[in-house]
């Protein structure tokens, strides 16, 4: 039996982080890039630091051994996540082999 984790990213508010707060959100990465962007904007709007604008990807789940950079484009994150959501562990192994 294979385990399946929906690819997701933890995006942190850097303004909050730099001021001693841990504020961020786990976001489903297997969606359109604009939807990821909207979720990040909502997370920033709820930040304990007013007018927060900067973010970074601090953690990922469901991407196998693939490395997701902290400033990876939402388009790239979305493409990888959609592929992995569709193909699971075998898809992760293929991507890992060719990266």
Specify the residue positions occupied by each region the protein language model found:
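Structured domain cores in non-transmembrane regions
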Residues: 33-99
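N-terminal ordered "arm"
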Residues: 2-46
